[in-house]
C-alpha cells in the first residue's frame, strides 16, 4: 500500500502526514516495525534449505545463557525465544538447515548428555508469513471496529502459505553485495535504507584492517532492483495490536483431522480480530508422528486472547494443539528492573557470507560436523568442572 493509498484509507487530506505519523507516533509507541523482507530460498541456493523450528526442554541447572551460547555454535541459527518454564526451562529455537539429520544429531547428542531433557523438531515449508491485525471490518457500507479476542474460528478460508510463485524458481548467481544486502533486508537492518546501509558497510574493517565492503550507492540500488525484479525479495511490515512491550507472545502448533482442515484452521485462527500472526505449514520430523503436517505460528496478542486460545480450540476439527507461552518482554529496556533472559530474545538473518556460499555452484553449505565437534568440546569441558 502506498502512502497516498494509506492517507485515503485513514482519511488524511495530505499523504505526507502518513510518514510523519508512521515515524513519530506508530514506531515510537511500538505499534509498527519494519520494513522486513521475505526471501525466496529456492532462488538463492540450488540446494535445499529450510528452517527448522525446535522446541527444547532443559534442566534448570543449565541457564538460558548457557543453552544460547551452546546452540549459537550452529552458525545457521535463526532465533531464540525463552518460554515460560514449568518443571524445566524451555526455549523455542529456529535453525536454517541444509542437512536435517546433521542438526538432529547435535540435539540428540545434547539429550544423551543430559543437557536437554526433551526436544521436538518441525520443518517449515516456506517463510513464516506475517498476518497483521484486522482493526475494522465492513458491515454493509459501514466500518465496524474489531475486537482483541476471537470469538470463534472462521473455517471458510484456506491457508495459502506461499509468498513467491512456485513456477519461477530458477536459482540465481548472487554477488557478494547481493548476499550482504539480502541479509540486511531480511532482518530489517536500518529499515532497509540503502544510503544508511552503504555508509555502515564502508566503515567495516576486516581482520587485515581493510575496508572490503565499499560499494557506491548506484551498486546498492542496482542490487536491490535486481533482487526485486527477479522475485527474490518481498517487503512487509509488522503491526502490533498493542504496543509491542505489552503484547502477550506465544507459539501454537496445530493440526486438524486432515491436511485440508489444518489449512482451514491456519487461515481462520485470529483472522478477524486484532491479533498479529506469523505462521507457516510445518512437517514433523519426530519419530512418534514423522511426516505429519501441522501449522506453526507465533502470535502477538492482547493478554486475554493468550489465555483464551486453548478453549477457543476445543472444537471437533482440532486433533493436535500445542501452546508454548513466551516469557514476558514487558520490561525490555528497563534498566531499573532488568530481566536476566531478555538478551535471549534474539533473531538473525540467514547466513550468506563467503564461507557459507559457493558462488560457482550457487549453494549454501554449513559445516555441521564442525558445529557438532565444537559443541561436544564445550559439553566435555562443562562436565569436567
Residue ranges, per PLM feature:
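A compositional/biophysical signature of low hydrophobicity enriched in polar/charged and small residues
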Residues: 1-385
Amino acid at each position: 500500500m502506498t502512502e497516498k493509498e494509506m492517507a485515503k484509507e485513514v482519511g488524511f487530506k495530505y499523504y505526507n502526514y502518513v510518514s510523519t505519523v508512521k515515524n513519530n507516533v506508530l514506531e515510537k509507541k511500538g505499534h509498527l516495525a519494519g520494513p522486513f523482507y521475505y526471501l525466496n530460498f529456492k532462488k538463492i541456493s540450488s540446494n535445499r534449505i529450510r528452517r527448522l523450528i525446535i522446541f527444547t526442554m532443559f534442566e534448570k541447572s543449565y541457564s538460558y545463557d548457557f543453552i544460547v551460547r551452546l546452540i549459537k555454535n550452529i552458525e545457521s541459527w535463526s532465533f531464540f525465544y525463552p518460554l515460560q518454564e514449568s518443571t524445566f526451562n524451555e526455549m523455542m529455537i529456529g535453525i536454517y538447515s541444509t542437512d536435517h539429520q546433521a542438526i538432529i544429531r547435535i540435539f540428540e547428542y545434547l539429550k544423551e548428555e543430559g543437557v536437554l531433557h526433551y526436544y521436538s523438531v518441525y520443518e517449515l515449508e516456506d517463510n513464516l508469513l506475517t498476518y497483521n491485525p484486522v482493526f475494522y471490518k465492513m458491515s454493509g457500507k459501514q466500518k465496524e471496529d474489531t475486537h482483541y479476542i476471537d470469538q470463534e474460528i472462521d473455517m471458510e478460508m484456506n491457508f495459502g502459505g506461499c509468498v513467491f510463485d512456485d513456477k519461477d524458481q530458477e536459482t540465481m548467481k548472487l554477488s557478494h553485495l547481493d548476499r550482504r544486502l539480502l541479509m540486511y533486508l531480511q532482518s530489517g537492518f536500518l529499515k532497509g535504507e540503502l544510503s544508511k546501509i552503504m555508509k555502515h558497510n564502508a566503515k567495516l574493517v576486516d581482520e587485515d584492517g581493510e575496508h572490503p565492503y565499499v560499494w557506491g550507492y548506484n551498486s546498492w540500488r542496482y542490487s536491490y532492483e535486481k533482487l526485486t525484479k527477479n522475485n527474490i525479495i518481498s517487503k512487509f511490515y509488522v503491526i502490533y495490536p498493542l504496543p509491542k512491550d505489552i503484547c502477550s507472545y506465544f507459539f501454537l502448533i496445530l493440526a486438524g483431522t486432515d491436511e485440508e482442515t489444518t489449512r482451514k484452521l491456519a487461515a481462520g485462527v485470529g483472522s478477524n480480530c486484532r491479533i498479529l500472526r506469523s505462521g507457516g505449514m510445518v512437517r514433523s520430523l519426530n519419530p512418534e508422528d514423522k511426516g505429519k503436517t501441522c501449522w506453526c505460528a507465533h502470535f502477538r496478542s492482547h493478554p486475554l486472547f493468550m489465555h483464551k486460545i486453548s478453549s477457543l480450540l476445543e472444537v471437533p476439527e482440532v486433533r493436535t494443539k500445542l501452546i508454548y507461552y513466551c516469557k514476558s518482554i514487558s520490561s525490555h529496556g528497563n534498566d531499573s528492573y532488568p530481566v536476566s533472559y531478555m538478551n535471549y530474545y534474539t533473531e538473525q538473518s540467514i547466513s550468506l557470507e563467503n564461507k557459507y556460499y559457493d558462488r560457482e555452484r550457487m549453494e549454501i553449505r554449513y559445516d555441521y560436523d564442525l558445529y557438532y565437534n565444537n559443541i561436544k568440546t564445550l559439553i566435555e569441558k562443562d562436565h569436567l568442572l
